[in-house]
Amino acid sequence: MKIYCVGDSITWGATLEEDISRRWTDLVAAETEHEVINCGLNGDTTTGMLMRCHTQLFPQKPDLILFLGGTNDICHTWEYRQACANIVSVVLNAREQGIPVMVGIPLPIVARRLLPRPWAPDRDADFIAGQFEAYARWLEVWCRERDVPAVDFHRPFLREDGSVREELFSDALHPNAAGHRLMADVLCRALEDLMR
């Protein structure tokens, strides 16, 4: 199966530039029969991803698009509504063209590692972390209610008590090599379930 993974720096593997073969997408490609194409773009928002789907990916007629986005939407605007609208648009437009979409539920963030934003004192790290949590829950419910396949990258990065597994991150947002390994394992299981 040819899988196009659309995303931002988390998909691209921004913190693994020295060895991009350790990105989650590359690990999945190496460990399965699937052809996995990394379409991550550092700094991209779901609006940019939506446009890239229309101009670059839909014409390729992939067997599956994995859409993992929203991190930059929240970091730039402090809310997730536009990301929700863009994901709905991608899924509906892809379905019209007969292209299956799997939605990735994004990672949590390490709130204490976020840099303070003096121009927005009412938007502290805990507020932003709450937006990520709310977005993840919205995606989970929306995908379930609409019968859209989803891969939950969020919960595996949390401990049982709900705290973030910081050892899997290189900074506030990006997974390190161990985090990429975990993402690959999660996606491999999700693809197995999808193929059943």
How should each PLM-predicted stretch be described?
Residues D26, A30-E31, E35, M51-R196:
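Alpha-helical cap/lid subdomain in secreted, periplasmic
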Residues M1-G48, R52-K61:
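Serine-esterase "nucleophile elbow" of acetyl-processing enzymes
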